[in-house]
Amino acid sequence: IFVDRLTFYIDTILIGEVLEGTMAKIAVIGAGYVGLTTGACLASLGHDVVVADNDNDRVNSLKIGEIPFFEPGLKELVGKVVDSQRLSFVFGAANASKEAEFHFLCLPTPSNKDGSSDLSFLEEGINEISSVLNPNSIVVNKSTVPLGTAKKIQNSLGRNGAHVVSNPEFLREGE
């Protein structure tokens, strides 16, 4: 199943409506296609968004306005929300999550040779943010994962008082 950009944007707007009336502090973990577009859209709605990645070169490129992939209008949107100081980029998930109320996990889950999902990137992100989550934080998993993964995340993060929401992305890039 693929979701077009309009549906992705509407999905982000719906999340934004949940946050409407607030100036939420949001951490987006993962600066790939899903993470960067999610972060830029949420920042355009007025939220304070920090996008984190463990690739220091990617973070440095984003800080100077270099977008690592093509998506119509994204470069301009990122520039606008960075200039308005609503979007910033950091190295390391914990650095983004320290002050955040909402944490969007947008990490790759590539397929293993046997067809199962490699959850190592997701697990690494969860481990990084677990020590800095504020009580009652909302963790939104946008990574595409097998059934039962949300429960595992809740078991890992629930001891911190975090609540887990599953909102996976199925999309087609750059058309």
What are these regions (language model features)?
Residues 110-173:
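Rossmann-like NAD(P)(H) cofactor-binding subdomain of soluble oxidoreductases
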Residues 1-22:
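Short, Lys/Arg-enriched N-terminal segments with co-localized hydrophobic residues
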Residues 46, 84-86, 136, 161:
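A generic structural signal for alpha->beta connector loops
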Residues 48, 54-102, 108-116:
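Conserved N-terminal Rossmann-fold NAD(P) cofactor-binding segment
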Residues 19, 174-175:
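Short, intrinsically disordered, charge-balanced linker/junction segments flanking boundaries
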Residues 23-66:
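NAD(P)+-binding Rossmann beta1-loop-alpha1 motif at the extreme N-terminus of oxidoreductases
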